Amino acid sequence: MWPTNAKARAWARSAAAEMHSGFGPLRNICPMSCGVRVALHQPVPSGLLQDLQRLQTLWTEGLQRFGGPFLAGEKFTAVDAFYCPIAFRVQTYALPLSDACQAYVDTLLALPSMQAWYQDALKEPWLEPVHDADVLAFGALVQDQRAAALKPPAPSPP
């Protein structure tokens, strides 16, 4: 679950703790929603930009220090699991990242478990209007791939 190398493990635990307790603007402005694509309103809130800068600093440190392609080295570990929801947010909101950080996101999104998670999310048979409103509070819907959104409306009773 955690890296076997002591330095990588210590760094990974610290990075996971930061994900657990931080990135409030990112979480609030870009709620998790796999099946939609959202264009953020401009200008992008400064808190989100600050979170993206910190995220990239953190990811770049791990990728460079431990050689990638995952944050603490060659193998997917718990720290990467903590950042998987962020990979989906990057995809949903087209968040701007450096090439190295985007490559890390692409690596996460290509994992079979992430692909399964994404496909399962698309198949959910319901919509959540309150959550959808949160998702669109800072942006405009560009695309909706969710099965529930693609269903034709039920016929009206006579």
Question: How would you name each of these model-derived features?
Answer:
Residues 1-46, 60, 148-158:
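GST-like domain detector, emphasizing the conserved glutathione-binding G-site
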Residues 1-11, 66-78, 100:
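All-alpha amphipathic helical-bundle segments outside canonical DNA-binding/catalytic cores
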Residues 2, 27, 48, 52, ...:
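Tryptophan-centric aromatic hotspots in well-structured domains and transmembrane helices
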Residues 39-49, 103-118:
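Short, mixed-charge aromatic SLiMs
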Residues 42-65, 71:
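A contiguous binding-surface segment within folded domains or other stable secondary-structure elements
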Residues 71-96, 100-102, 106-110, 118:
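GST superfamily/GST-like fold recognition
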Residues 121-158:
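Acidic/histidine-enriched, glycine/proline-rich intrinsically disordered or flexible terminal extensions
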